[in-house]
């Protein structure tokens, strides 16, 4: 899964941070439908997980509302969706288990999260984490290829898998009584994966076709690929999750097995169970299925990656393509994540993104779409859920006849205004309420709850960090928002990408036809 989301723009406009493989399975074949979003923007895809311009706010808050601990105002009556707060325990082999009781329906969601993503790949092997995600469906000694997926379908369940820069996860949602079966399958493929060239090489072709379809033939995705590479000069977040084409085509069985043996182990995983169960029911199942799997001693206690130097100058990227119908610009700033930020900074960036770019009352939308109007869309976004520094993004699509320079002048003016002057009290309260309310309205998805606990925990946050998020949002002051804009939205910290129509190529192609 490549996921990060951008408001007002199609999925293909999202920076490639995570590959989501929507898996369609039949008894004879498996087809992977990859989507290329990335973290900060609005999406309307499976699981209902990206409904917000500020996805980090949603992901943390969705978990919070599931526990019933969020209170205040009109949200009070809607927060009691689970019968108990999440429970966490750790097996002797290092497997962390999180149980999220949800008694509304007799179904459960099992998600296993491995603390490894594309940023953990060896240089020259880009796309390996995602490639292995595909191969994890190729069977084990105990269960031949297709049996796991066929079992999920037979019991009326569904499944999915995704790879991001920081993690890889596998998911099943099934009737409650099938949890033990799902757990047995999942534990089995943690150690028993069998890979043969007759399965590996065709699957590599599937991934290459994904790249061709979703990136090579998609101008929006190509631009995002280039922006990310320019933003991250040294950090592996600059590599696309799906990989570079010339490196994907060289990946083989030995690469996949080495990666699997290195990273797929209980002490590098988090098992999240959400649904009509509690810890007392889940623990014996986990111990029976996962307890005997040995830990991998070579896995470090903390992931250490090359970090970015202090940005020294703004950068620009221009992509011209004859298929472009709507020119657009997007600017990404290098900013701290919830894991790397100083106290209060991440929450202030959450609020700043909501203030600047979420909805028709946001500052950018009003300045560019309503007041002028110079653009057909405008937005801003931030995602805190990242092990290392992440991005704050602004985007706009100019109207015909409007230059990028005109649009950027307005964007820069809005940022300067926010950075120099504390925002109005009524605006601050409005966006805080929006952050809370939007998340509450989206809480009715069990898989969402499991996904965002897993995402937060695999990127260095704790359950307490998740549970205390509403209080941190409520505590954000106007001065903190102003300071965040001033400190982090400096032009030198940014890469601006321009997507334009290549009219010369289009004319040459018309002449040839």
Predicted regions: what is each one?
Residues 73-111, 116-118, 144-177, 214-267, ...:
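Non-catalytic beta-strand/loop surface segments
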Residues 126-140:
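Active-site SXXK
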Residues 18-21, 59:
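Cysteine-centered motifs
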Residues 40-50:
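Short, Lys/Arg-enriched N-terminal segments with co-localized hydrophobic residues
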Residues 139-142, 173-204, 283, 360, ...:
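M16/insulysin-pitrilysin zinc metalloprotease superfamily fold
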Residues 59-69:
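Bacterial N-terminal signal peptides
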């Amino acid at each position: 899964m490549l996921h990060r989301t951008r408001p007002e723009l199609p999925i293909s406009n999202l920076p490639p941070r995570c590959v989501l493989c929507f898996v369609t399975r039949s008894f004879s074949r498996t087809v992977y439908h990859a989507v290329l979003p990335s973290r900060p923007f609005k999406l309307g895809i499976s699981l209902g997980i990206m409904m917000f311009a500020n996805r980090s706010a949603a992901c943390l808050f969705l978990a919070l509302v599931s526990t019933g601990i969020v209170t205040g105002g009109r949200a009070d009556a809607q927060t009691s969706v689970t019968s108990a707060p999440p429970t966490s325990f750790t097996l002797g082999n290092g497997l962390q288990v999180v149980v999220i009781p949800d008694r509304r329906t007799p179904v459960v969601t099992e998600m296993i999260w491995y603390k490894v993503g594309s940023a953990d790949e060896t240089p020259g092997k880009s796309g390996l984490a995602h490639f292995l995600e595909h191969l994890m469906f190729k069977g084990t000694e105990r269960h031949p290829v297709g049996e796991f997926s066929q079992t999920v379908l037979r019991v009326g369940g569904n499944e999915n898998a995704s790879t991001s820069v920081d993690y890889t996860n596998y998911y099943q949602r099934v009737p409650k009584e099938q949890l033990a079966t799902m757990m047995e399958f999942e534990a089995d493929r943690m150690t028993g994966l069998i890979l043969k060239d007759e399965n590996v090489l065709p699957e590599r072709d599937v991934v290459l076709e994904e790249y061709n379809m979703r990136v090579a033939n998609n101008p929006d995705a190509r631009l995002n690929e280039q922006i990310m590479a320019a933003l991250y000069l040294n950090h592996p977040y600059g590599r696309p999750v799906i990989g570079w084409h010339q490196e994907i085509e060289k990946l083989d069985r030995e690469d996949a097995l080495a990666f699997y043996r290195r990273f797929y182990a209980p002490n590098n995983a988090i098992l999240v169970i959400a649904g009509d169960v509690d810890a007392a029911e889940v623990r014996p199942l986990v111990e029976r299925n996962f307890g005997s799997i040995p830990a991998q001693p070579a896995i470090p206690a903390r992931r250490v990656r090359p970090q970015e130097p202090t940005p020294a100058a703004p950068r620009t990227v221009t992509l011209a393509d004859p298929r472009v119908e709507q020119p657009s610009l997007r600017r990404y700033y290098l900013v701290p994540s919830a894991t790397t930020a100083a106290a209060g900074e991440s929450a202030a960036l959450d609020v700043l993104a909501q203030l600047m770019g979420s909805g028709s009352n946001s500052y950018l939308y009003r300045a560019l779409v309503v007041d002028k109007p110079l653009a057909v869309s405008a937005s801003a976004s931030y995602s805190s859920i990242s092990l290392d520094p992440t991005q704050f993004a602004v985007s706009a699509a100019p109207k015909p006849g409007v230059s990028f320079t005109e649009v950027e002048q307005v964007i820069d003016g809005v940022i300067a205004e926010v950075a120099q002057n504390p925002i109005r009290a009524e605006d601050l309260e409005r966006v805080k309420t929006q952050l809370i309310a939007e998340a509450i309205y989206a809480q009715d998805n069990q898989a969402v709850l499991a996904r965002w606990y897993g995402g937060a925990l695999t990127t260095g946050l704790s359950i307490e960090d998740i549970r205390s998020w509403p209080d941190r949002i409520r505590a954000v002051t106007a001065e903190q928002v102003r300071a965040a804009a001033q400190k982090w939205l400096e032009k030198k910290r940014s890469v601006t990408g321009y997507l334009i129509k290549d009219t010369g190529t289009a004319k040459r192609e018309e002449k040839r036809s």
